[in-house]
Amino acid sequence: MSIDADWRVQLLVEYSKDQFACEALVGQVTDHWYRVMDEVIYYRDQIFLTANSQLREKILHATHDSPLSWHQGFTKTYRAIRERFSWKGLKEDVLRHVRE
């Protein structure tokens, strides 16, 4: 799975500021669901975002608010994001964003 080059740069900067991400990048996380490929952390098969990632809002906006998405409801927005990304509180963030 690939991501936009600008998003990738931002993701790597965010990883460098997050203790868990730094540990995952050097192989110190024992949970077998996490893996690193080309400096990107994956949880299962989704790109892992840190707790304070600024990419969350960009992803929510791109998935729910873009003209091509037609303001999908919660379920479609959640599923679309969950296919590619993983972060703690994803479901709650999607619910909040869809309600706004």
For every predicted segment, state its role:
Residues 59-62, 76-80:
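A general alpha-helix detector
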Residues 77-100:
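Amphipathic alpha-helical
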